Each structure stands twice: as C-alpha cells, then as structure tokens.
UniProtKB/Swiss-Prot annotation:
Disulfide bonds: none annotated. Pathway: Carbohydrate metabolism; lactose degradation; D-galactose 6-phosphate and beta-D-glucose from lactose 6-phosphate: step 1/1. D-galactose 6-phosphate binds at Q19, H116, N159, E160, N297, S428, W429, K435, Y437. This is 6-phospho-beta-galactosidase. GO terms for biological process: lactose catabolic process via tagatose-6-phosphate. It is an enzyme of class 3 (hydrolase). It catalyses: a 6-phospho-beta-D-galactoside + H2O = D-galactose 6-phosphate + an alcohol.
C-alpha cells in the first residue's frame, strides 16, 4: 500500500555553516579549531566547501523550484563573535540577515542552529564545553542572536551534542583529537545540555514568538543476541553514552537512577569522575518542559555484543567498507548481523531503527511535544554522468525512511517534518569531499549545481505527500 505524509509536513533540506559556507576567514570571521586541525590531520580543508556564503541565492532558488519548503542553517558563532564573545562582527550579522531574507523570499522556512560543531578557536583551546565559562559565553551568544534575528521562527541550540563529545574525546576524529576518555565525553554532554537549558529558559522568559528545541543524533542500539543478558547490557550501556544521558537531561531535567548506574559503571571501568552540580539540575529542571520540539538526526543503528577486552576504535574515513572497528572496555563491541546492509563507510542501513527511536521518545519522554527529523540521508561516492547523478540507492534509502515516518505518525507520534542531509553536496568533517549526500551535485571546482535524480523524486513527494 502506498503511504502518505500530512499536508502540512515540512520537506526540508539540511546544511551547516562550516560544511557549506566556505569563506572561513572572510569579512571578519574568527578562526575555529577545525581550521588548523584539518590542515594538520587531513587531506582537505573547508575551503571553499559549497561556497554557500556567496551562492546561497542559487541554492535557495533550487530549493524553491524542487519543493523544498524548509532549510536547516547554522550560524557560525565566530562570524558573529570572532573570539566567541565581546566585539560583534557587523558583517557577519549582515550576512545572516541577508540569508534569512532570501529564505523567506523563496518561501523556504529557515530552521536555525546556533552551534553545529564549530566553537570559536579562542574558546575551544580553553577547554571548549569542558570549561564551564563556555556555558555563559554560549548563552550570551544565544541571547544576542534571539534579539538580533526576530525573522527566525525556529531555533535549535545545538546540533548533535552526543557526536561532539564522541568525536572530540572518544573516537578522537574531531579537535582536540582525544581518544577513549569517557569522563570527558559525559562531562561535555552534561555541560552542553546545561547550556541548552539556560538558552531555552532565556528564550521563553523574553517572550519571543518563535519555537526552540535541540537536535540530537539518536542511533538506535540493539543487542546482537536479545536472549543473552550480557549483549542486552552492552546495548543498554552503549545507549546511555549516545542517547539516554542526553535525552534524560533534555526531558527529565535529571539523570534517572538507571542512567547514573550505567554511567558510574562505565567510569568505574574506564576511569574518571564527573562534576555535576546542584545548580546544573536547577537549570535542566527549569527547561525540561519548555522545548517546543526535538530534532532527531538518524542515519543508522548498531548491534552490540558483550566484550571484555581493551578499547579500540578505528574510524572508516575513506569509504573502505569493513575497515571500521568499535569496541569499548566494560561496555561492548559493535557487530552487525548478516541481514543488514551497510554503506561504504560502514554505516548500517536500518530504517526500522528510526521508528523504534521515535516510539522510544514518545513512550519514555511524553513531554516531547513534536519531532522533526532534522537529518537523514545516504552518503555516496556519486558518479556524475550526463550532468546528473542516477542515485537510485539514495532514493530507496530516503523512501524507506519516509515510509517509516508515515507509520510512526499513524501510530500516534507527532512528527512534523523531514530534512534530507543534505540540500546540496557539502564538505564532510572526517571524510572530505568524496562522500556526497546532496539532492544537488556540486562541482567543487566550478561550484556549479546539478539536480540529481533524487531531487526530481523528492520534488514529486513534496508536492503530493505521496511516498512513491
């Protein structure tokens, strides 16, 4: 049976400042940690990325032409405050006013994120969100943006608090490149959630007319053998690291006894302790019912089995299928069952995981209000032929996930929109320019845009709400 989505459903496309804008040192923009980190550790940089800084009118015109009625944009913090605080960069402010005006001109609603992996270097080198001073700096930055940009109707504080901590302190593929420090992972998650809570409370106290939420990456975790208690435990612990800890902070305003038992076990095995203060929980508690929506980024699920050995994580950054490894002492090891398929970057394709995660939020956090799928898509080594890309695999991937959303809505979940990652091809943090996600192919040398087959398909779905 053909499935449908509601008439008022947002069919969006997602971007991020550092991955799309380029212009990393233009018009007074301050440095971010990624600038030097990429030069020192990778074979690519974020110049020119998709040159969105100059070509956003082209991308928004394409969005309008192809039925995309929402766009995720992030503000580059260091474009507004080059050092993270203090002096405002007027040219950065002007750029975002112009960008948001173009969005509204093209009838593409901007969903604006304040922080998408790009803390200004001056703050990052001072401990980033492990340093509690950053909480205050972030809230000041948020307060400025809320007041300066009343044309924005939908705000999110952070993009993917979980993967920021993981990338910086567990996998070590984000600056500062620290590996296997679980205490830093949890502390980063916690301090960022306190920052989120303070910003949300401020937004509501000021009486702004828009909506505000947060974007969490929520990869669903399953036991490899559901009958094996050790595998079940491994999946539960992995879920605490990546999902439950930050969801509890968002919607409970505290960490459940079950969550803290898992955290304490993980730290007892791996070392370290947390600084959780009474005033933190006062802030979390005050904001737990103020979130207007939850953004869920979903790409994949993982299966876990019990594991007693030493921690080892190998990141597959070049699309060499089967080269990744993930095992954490005292938690478990990721082992994919035979029946699931995976991408060249070892990301497991499992649409059912999105349904299960949405229903988990609905059941465990009934104060969630509504959900947007703020990122979902398929990274490909696209083959550019005849001025297009015949990306049937991407179409199939998105179709399956949209069908899952139709099912979730039918089963009572309040899902209001979907943002494909990404609107156009963008630079990828730890994969460079080879891994493409866009509806529009970008020739990174000429910066020309070309609609892929998926863009034509997405337009039809957006216009009809029929998933076909």
């Amino acid at each position: 049976m053909t499935k449908t989505l509601p008439k008022d459903f947002i069919f969006g496309g997602a971007t991020a400042a550092y991955q799309a804008e380029g212009a990393t040192h233009t018009d007074g923009k301050g440095p971010v940690a990624w600038d030097k980190y990429l030069e020192d550790n990778y074979w690519y940089t974020a110049e020119p990325a998709s040159d969105f800084y100059n070509r956003y009118p082209v991308d928004l015109k394409l969005a309008e032409e192809y039925g995309v009625n929402g766009i995720r944009i992030s503000i580059a913090w260091s474009r507004i405050f080059p050092t993270g605080y203090g002096q405002v960069n007027a040219k950065g402010v002007e750029f975002y006013h112009n960008l948001f005006a173009e969005c509204h001109k093209r009838h593409v609603e901007p969903f604006v994120t304040l922080h998408h992996f790009d803390t200004p270097e001056a703050l990052h080198s001072n401990g980033d969100f492990l340093n509690r001073e950053n909480i205050e700096h972030f809230v000041d930055y948020a307060a400025f943006c809320f007041e300066e940009f009343p044309e924005v109707n939908y705000w999110t504080t952070f993009n993917e608090i979980g993967p920021i901590g993981d990338g910086q302190y567990l996998v070590g593929k984000f600056p500062p490149g620290i590996q296997y420090d679980l205490a830093k992972v949890f502390q980063s998650h916690h301090n960022m959630m306190v920052s989120h809570a303070c910003a949300v409370k401020l937004y509501k106290e000021k009486g702004y007319k828009g909506e505000i939420g947060v974007v969490h990456a929520l990869p669903t975790k399953y036991p490899l053998d559901p009958e094996n208690p050790a595998d079940v435990r491994a999946a539960e612990l992995e879920d605490i690291i990546h999902n439950k800890f930050i969801l509890d902070a968002t919607y409970l305003g505290r960490y459940s006894a079950e969550t803290m038992e898992g955290v304490n076990h993980i730290l007892s095995v791996n070392g370290g302790s947390l600084d959780l203060r009474e005033e933190d929980f006062t802030a979390l508690e005050a904001a737990k019912d103020l979130n207007d929506f939850l953004g869920i980024n979903y790409y994949m699920s993982d299966w876990m089995e019990a594991f007693d050995g030493e921690t080892e994580i190998i990141h597959n950054g070049k699309g060499e299928k089967g080269s990744s490894k993930y095992q954490i002492k005292g938690i478990g090891r990721r082992v994919a069952p035979d029946y699931v398929s995976r991408t060249d970057w070892d990301w497991i394709i499992y649409p059912q995981g999105l349904y299960d995660q949405i229903m988990r939020v609905k059941k465990d956090y009934p104060n969630y209000k509504k959900i947007y799928i703020t990122e979902n898509g398929l990274g490909y080594k696209d083959e550019f032929v005849d001025n297009t890309v015949y990306d049937d695999g991407r179409i199939d991937y998105v179709k399956q996930h949209l069908e899952i959303l139709s099912d979730a809505i039918a089963d009572g979940a309040n899902v209001k929109g979907y943002f494909i990652w990404s609107l156009m091809d963008v630079f990828s943090w730890s994969n460079g320019y080879e891994k493409r996600y866009g509806l529009f192919y970008v020739d990174f040398e000429t910066q020309e845009r070309y609609p892929k087959k998926s863009a034509h398909w997405y337009k039809k779905v957006a216009e009809t709400q029929i998933i076909d």
